[in-house]
Amino acid sequence: MPKILVDADACPVKAEIKQVAEQFQLDVIFVASFNHYSVNTNGENWIFVDTGKESADMRMMNLANKGDIIVTQDIGLASILLAKGTYVFSNRGELYREEEMSLMLDIRYRHAKERQQGKYSKGPKAMSDQDRVLFKDRMTTFFKNK
């Protein structure tokens, strides 16, 4: 049975993920750095890793199996996990596709270069209640069609 792995450090839709997981009786594993440690995990399955730059990513790569569902905003991690045969959602409910990754990684690279040159672009807009509903609807539809 597939599981849901969540890149939890900055994930704004943890509550929505838990609701969908309960609806479809799926296990959820939240992976976060010790910087986000809490004793209040409410019976959830949390794995805390070192605060190193790629520690959470490495742990998620090791935990992920073909058919698992991943939630991350990290395009680099998404591209690696897609190659493992997982399904990867963004925090906004977009289902990443392997054929899009090359372009997305190129855009990420160009934006990083622009930031190095002192050009700053706006970050993503804040999550609204409507965004949260959309995420939950998209994930629910995915599982209903699976």
UniProtKB/Swiss-Prot annotation:
InterPro entries in UniProt: UPF0178
Pfam families (alphabetical): DUF188
Family classification: Belongs to the UPF0178 family.
Protein's UniProt name: UPF0178 protein Lin1493
PANTHER family membership: UPF0178 PROTEIN YAII (PTHR35146:SF1)
Domain of life of the native organism: Bacteria
